[in-house]
Structures are given as C-alpha cells and as structure tokens.
Amino acid sequence: MCGIFGGVGVNVEDARRCLDNIRRGDDGITVKQFDDVVIGARRHLVKTSDKPGVVLGESDQPYGSDDGKVQMVLNGELYTFKEIRDSLAGRGHTFTSTGDTEVFLRLYEEEGKNFVKNEMIDSLFAIAILDQRSNELIITRDWPGRIPLFYYYDPANRVFLFSSELKGIREVNWVPLDDVVELTPGDIATLDLETFELNIQPYFRPTPVKTENGIMEIGAKLNDLLKISAHNRTMGDVPICVMFSGGIDSLLTSFYVLNSIDFSSVDYKPTGYVFAVEGFESEDVRRAKVAADGFKDIGFELKEIRSPRSTMVEDIPDVVATFETRKIKALSVYPLPIYYYLAPEMRKDGFKVTIGGHGVDELLGAYDAWKELTASHKVQTNVKSRLKFMANIYENMLRRASIIFMNRGPIEARFPFLQPDVCEYMLGIDARWLNISADNAETLARLMEDRGGPQDSWTDQMCDIHGYLTRYLDGGGEHPEDADEETRYEMEKLFWKLPMIVAGMKASQESFLPVDVLFNAKLRGQHGAGITDLETDIVNRFANLGNSDGEIFQNVVNQAFRLKSA
C-alpha cells in the first residue's frame, strides 16, 4: 500500500509536495518526469522488493519496462503475485525484483489494458501507467474500490492530475476541488497524450452467482472461499493484526486470517483491537472479550483502546477532514473515530497491516436502520439493494478504512469478504436464507445440537438462543407471545447472517474455533462503542458551524477543501 500522484500540468517539485501531503506511508518518496508527464509514489513497505539501485529513503517506484517506454506506479498489493509471476515467467518474461509491482508491469506488457481482467488477480490496487509507445496515460482501480483514486481533468488547459487522496491535489492551490472526480471502482481511464481526450470504460461489475443449493451447501462453499481469500491476505513481510469488535463479521475474519498464519515462524503474536469511548459501558468490548476467549488456544491477545469523550469531541474536525468526503452524511462520521484512534496504537505495537470484516452488511443487506439509513430489512436483502450497497461502499466504509488508517498509522487494511469471488457468491445468496423462518430456525437449532457439544457446556447466550428457537418452532414459526420487541428483533438479526453462522460451523469442525462464539450477536460497532452518544456534545461544541451534526460535518469539509458551498 502506497500513495501515488502524477499527471500533466505539474512539475517534479509540485508532485513531491503533493505526495508529502498524502501521508500514505513513511518508507520513502520518488518522483520522476518523462517529457511533460510526472509520476511518483510514496511507499508503505509491507513486502521487500529487492529492486536493484533503490536508494534508502526513496520509493522503489515507478517501475519501468526494459526499454523504459512503460512506467508504472502501484498503490496496493497483488496477493497472487507469485502465481502470476510464475505464469509470466513461463511465457518468457524475466524479473529484476521480487515484488508485486513489477508483476503488474509485466502483466500489462503481456496483455495490454486487458490485464485488469486477468482472472488470476486477487488484489487491492490503484495503478497509473505511462505508456510512451501508445502515448497514453492510464489510471485504474480495483472493484469494489478498496484503494482510493482521484483525478482532475482540464482539457482546455492541458491539465490532468491523479492522486491517491484529495489532500494531494489540494496542494495544487489553483485546482478547484469541487471539480476533482473519484474514479469509479472497476473502471479504467485512458488519456491520449496527443489529443488529450479522456476515455473511461468499466472493466468489471459484479455478477451475483445464484445457486439452488440449500443453506448447508452455501455455508460450506462460503467457508472454502473465505479460507482462500484470508490466506491470500496474509501476504507480506510485516506483522498483521485484526480488528476485533466481537460480532460475527470480525470474529470470522479474524479466525480465517489468524488460522492462516504459522505463529511459530513469526516474531509476533495473534493480536486484535477493540475501541470504545472512555467510561462507556461498551457492548463491543464485552462481546469482544467473550469472543477472544475462544481464541485462547492460539495465544490471542485482545487490546482494548479507549479515548476520553472530551478528546474525541475536540478531534472531530480533524477526523472529518481526514476522511475527505465532500458530500458527507452524519451516518458516515460516527464510525470514523474507531479507525482514527486504533491506527496509532496498532503502529506503536509494530503492526503495519490490519484485517477487517468489512462488507458483510452490504453483501447480505444486514444494516440496522439509523440516521439516514431507513430501508427495511426486506428491502435491503433484495439483490438490487445489495448491489447498490456494494456500488457505494467505496464512498464510505472503504474510504475510512483506507484513508484514515493510512493517514493515522500508516496501517494497511485488508478485507477477506471483499474479494470479488466471495462478493459475487454472497450477493447470489437468496433472501430466504437471510431471514428467520421455521425452516431456518429448525436448521440452526439442529446444527447447535449436532455440533455444539454437550448442552450442559453451552454458554448462557447459546442456551438462550436455542431455547428461543425451540419455542419459536413450537409456536408454528411465530415469535413467542411473551417475547418483547427487543428480543424478537435480536433473534431476527441473528438470521440476517445465517450463511455466516453455517460457514463458521463448518470451520469449527476443522479447527480450534468454538461453536459458542458464533452466537455472540451484538449491535453494530459505533453504537456499541459509545460514539453515537457524543452527538449532543459535538453539536454544542461546534454550534458556530451548524445546528445539527450533519450540518457541522459538512461545513468542516467545506472549509478543509475550499469547496464552493463554503
């Protein structure tokens, strides 16, 4: 993971100043100029490249073809670089380094702009390529947008700039930041350097993989896909930690990743982080501690990070500005402090990569209604709604994970659930498997009985869930009459992620994962961490910026990025 910047209309000094402001790594900056095109990178080293001639304190990018006619910079990681490298070597390509950027470069030389469609690629990336043979400057980014990539295009003045972050282009003070565009994930943009025409084409959009299989087969397949995705995301030469809030998303992500690492051969121990407001009785922390106990056999350490309310309120303007979302919603802001405060602690402990369970709520339509999000669960589980969630995930969840973690660490974030094969499979899961019903309740109750071990060893939570399911089934698939609304809702939410529970059941048969931790249900993170309780304090403290939290956040962004509405 790095920061990239370049284009036409700036010089080397401008580009270096812009890269200085991106803050996506502290392992060196290099900028080079080729005629009127400038291209540069800021390095966050997670895997050594052994590239000859790299000067200490500089990035190893850009990478050039043997004749120097093609130059590439990469922000990201190519998890399957070894397999692709071997394939290219078999086709006659030679390599001067052991890193993944050169593999992308050789793949481009072999396949041209279609290289992004290569099915062997498992990667998060934003890439810029200067091809002097075709006289083109090309930029592209992964789907669903795990790496940000912005551009500014002014053909009348022959200006085209690209940047990993809006803060980079902000350093070019004559650029109107309202006119900077974020490249859509799964698109590739080609600038003809002779005509200065810009052509943008999609190269990938997800196609849900529909299946007629039952929930047991679905869970088994999901388990297989997640094992592969998680294993790939352990690539690198640096310590890896996990985000661990205690819910099933972070629980399974942590399991699949940590189960892929041989801790006897590395010099760090399995570590997870959970955040909450200081003094808040956090459901996140309580659930995380319960879940962490299920990982004790591998020596797992859970670190609880807290921050005072007053500090968090004072930091909100910087938190919002770091997020650099120009049309911001209050819904998007309250999760941000988790990343803002975790990143420095992770880095202080020696980590450079973290793993998160991001994407599950979007893939399965499993959001609680809150703030601007009001769609019912039935609407959310519609495939069209889930595709729409995924189309927009880069503007919110992925931006905060990538930009805030990198700016505050730098920490690179990786997401096993957002591997395209995993996404397409989960998007294809029929909505009938995402709701409570008599059939689903019977399946889950039977699984608990068959795989949960002796019932006298079950946790109270697991006993309560099984007891509720028994009463639900005895009532003909209806909630017990004496169950209050909150209990009914929590039981319904359990089934929103039934495929995950079944996948976890399969994983528990193959590993150390205890079945009971799969039933550690909880509310979503920012609520359980106590951050939403800060709303009144924020509105009172920054009343000069607006009458509501949403208005305050928008005005902070307007001022930070010279927006016309400021």
Predicted features, each with a name:
Residues 1-310, 318-322:
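Cysteine-centered catalytic environments shared across enzyme families
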Residues 8-13, 90, 133-135, 146-149, ...:
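ATP-dependent adenylate-handling active sites, centered on carboxylate activation for C-N bond formation
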Residues 40, 494, 519-521:
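Short alpha-helical segments used as structural interaction elements across diverse proteins
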Residues 202-203, 438, 514-524:
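Conserved S-adenosyl-L-methionine
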